[in-house]
Structure formats: structure tokens, C-alpha cells
Amino acid sequence: MAAKSQIVTGDYADEYIRFLQLQLGGDRNFCYICVDVKSGMAAVVDPGFRAGWLSAAAAERGLKISCILITHGHSDHVAQAGRLADITGAPVYAGERERVPGSLVLTDGQRLNLGTRPITAFHTPGHSPGHLCYLFENRLMTGDLLFCGKVGGTGPGFPGSAEEEEWASLKRIASLPEETLVYPGHDYYGGDGRMPHSTIGCEKRNNPFLLCGSFEAFTHLKQNWDSYKREHGIR
């Protein structure tokens, strides 16, 4: 079923939940489908440009898309959210400071009930002003705040971004239990599927940005990231 640009890179299921990680092309974008097994209700996180494919993929698995969750308003994450809403009748949710047409606002700490299972939104600004992360059971979908071994961009190329806010947001999610699974918005580890997810503990031990001991060290690393990557063989 999946074309080269539409690949299921993770499919976890137990008696309570199902969780799918999908690579949907674009800039190695990840999309997620969170499922309450009991009700068959599903939430799609960051549909990107693949509304039709996602709708068909859910239908083939007997799932009903009941909500569409947006981490932030950049087009590679949100372009066809409205179309997916039209196809499924599901509402779109995003942060208050994001420009996502037709979306309902989620606030920090707000919970949505997906059948019998909650999804919690965390306001994590930095890469964008209204950026949200979503926690489903022990799975944290971090959008473009935190990647495997890297963090989201800030600066002139990202309007509304703020390094100080990103630093605070990273410190906040780093306080979650170390076994919390991290599912990023892009496959920037290597682009080859070798590490499509991580844990909070792994990132705290290995991510050079989370190893920074101060905001000043964090900004210095950001400013010198290209040379750091060359020195350490990071792609």
C-alpha cells in the first residue's frame, strides 16, 4: 500500500492503544496516528501533504479519525489538515499562537479524550511561538522542538522563533521521566530510518544541545552547529 514517500516506520499495539509512525515524504516528515483500541478512535498528528493517503490508511485499519492535532503551523506539517478535516469531519487543534486556519485552540496542559485514552498538549515555544508537543501514554510527539540528536531551528529563517523560549521548552520536556519515548517531526538523525525515535534519557545523555549547561552554551552551539557537525561526523 505504501509508496516510497509514504512508509510505516513504526506500528505498536497492545490491548489499550495502537501507535503508528509514518514517514510521509516532504522533508523526511513524520506523521503519527494515535489509536484507542477499545473505541477505534484515532488522532492524526501533523498530516502534512497526505490527507487522502492518511484517510485511506485509517479506513483500511478500521479506524475513525476523530481529531487532527498540529504541533505547529509550518506547511510541511499542516498543509492538508483542512482537507483531512473535510474528508473525516474531524476537528483540527493547534496552539493559540499558530496560524492554522479553522483550528480550535489547545492550551498548555489541556487534555483531549481519545475514546478512553487521554492525549495531553504541552505548549513548547521556540521553533515557533505556539508550538505544541503531545503526550499519548508514554509517547511524546515533539514536532520540531526536539529531534533525535538535534533540535529545531531558530533565527531569521523561522519567523516567530526564539532561542530563549526553545531552551526553556527543552529543559521542561527533559524533566519528563527518562523512559518517555520521543517521536520527532522529522527523521533528521540520518534520514535512513536507523533511529526513528528515542527516549528522554537517551537525548539527555547524547543530544549535544541537551548537554549544554547554560543558555549561553546552547546559543553558542546553535551559532556554530555546522562546524560542530563536521568535527563530530554528524550528518
Positions of predicted regions on the chain:
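Metallo-beta-lactamase
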Residues: 129-231
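Conserved beta-strand hairpin/beta-sheet module of binuclear metal-dependent hydrolase folds
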Residues: 7-61, 133-143, 149
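Hydrophobic residues at beta-strand termini and immediately following loops
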Residues: 22, 106, 124, 200
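Core dinuclear metal-dependent hydrolase active-site scaffold
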Residues: 33, 111-136, 175
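Histidine-centered catalytic micro-motifs
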Residues: 68-78, 122-130, 183-189
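Active-site HxH/HxHxD metal-binding segment of metal-dependent hydrolases
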Residues: 28, 39-42, 47-120, 205-209
